[in-house]
């Protein structure tokens, strides 16, 4: 005999939905690579805003032809756009591949090709890295530059798209799909092993269980009253799961940005 209480899969999309409904006004502060019209690099918004923009990026990816299990990469710092991608990519069943920009160029080529990434979201800082290797990464169909139109660089990257333009044209209405909670949610490659970097896949279930453990009093004790600055890079073991824990509890998140 099986119990059926709360018989629903543990999915990452559930975290951002919970954040939007239970902690809508919790603040997310982020330092950007670019500045706004006033010369400010600090960006502020709420969990509700992040949830809407996550749905926008999800809808944009679906329109671009993203499928479940497709690998979609990021080459980015800890910032609010990267946070949106944590949910927008994995939420539709695609796999978020967070790339460590501190790897050697030949290692970047190896892991992008090995993962067979279809698109790469890239912060302004790392555009030159990709320009130098773009002819060697055959699976990549295009690059989404994480900036607004006013700060788009003059780049040789083929099929370069502005992040803000992409989501401006997308709807924030989306019913997140349900699928097996053991499906891959994110992909990280090792950076300190012998030979080529090794890929490690995290499931939706493992990610949520890790976040649940992390917020406990016996671990980090994260609550809605907490203010957290994730120093661990979002390309390193998913910043130790802190972005997910922030969404789970409604803690204030402060992303340090480039550097």
Whereabouts are the PLM-identified features?
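Conserved AMP-binding/adenylation subdomain of ANL enzymes
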Residues: 208-227, 235-259
């Amino acid at each position: 005999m099986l119990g059926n209480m709360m018989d629903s899969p543990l999915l990452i999309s559930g975290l951002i939905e919970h954040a939007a409904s239970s902690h809508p006004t919790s603040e997310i502060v982020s330092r950007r690579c670019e500045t706004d019209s006033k010369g400010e690099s600090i960006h502020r918004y709420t969990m509700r805003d992040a949830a809407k923009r996550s749905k926008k990026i999800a809808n944009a990816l679906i329109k671009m032809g993203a499928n479940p299990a497709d690998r979609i990469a990021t080459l980015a710092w800890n910032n609010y756009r990267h946070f949106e991608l944590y949910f927008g990519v994995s939420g539709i069943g695609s796999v978020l591949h967070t790339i460590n920009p501190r790897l050697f160029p030949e290692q970047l080529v190896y892991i992008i090709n090995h993962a067979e990434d279809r698109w790469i979201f890239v912060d302004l800082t790392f555009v030159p890295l990709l320009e130098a290797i773009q002819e060697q990464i055959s699976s990549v169909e295009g690059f989404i530059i994480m900036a607004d139109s006013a700060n788009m660089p003059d780049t040789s990257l083929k099929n370069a798209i502005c992040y803000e333009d992409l989501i401006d044209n997308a709807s924030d209405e989306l019913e997140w799909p349900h699928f097996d909670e053991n499906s891959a949610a994110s992909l990280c490659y090792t950076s300190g092993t012998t030979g080529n970097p090794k890929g490690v896949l995290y499931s939706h279930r493992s990610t949520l269980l890790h976040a649940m453990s992390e917020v406990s009093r016996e671990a980090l004790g994260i609550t809605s009253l907490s203010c957290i600055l994730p120093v661990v890079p979002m390309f390193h073991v998913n910043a130790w799961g802190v972005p997910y824990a922030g969404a789970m509890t409604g803690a204030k998140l402060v992303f340090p940005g480039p550097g």
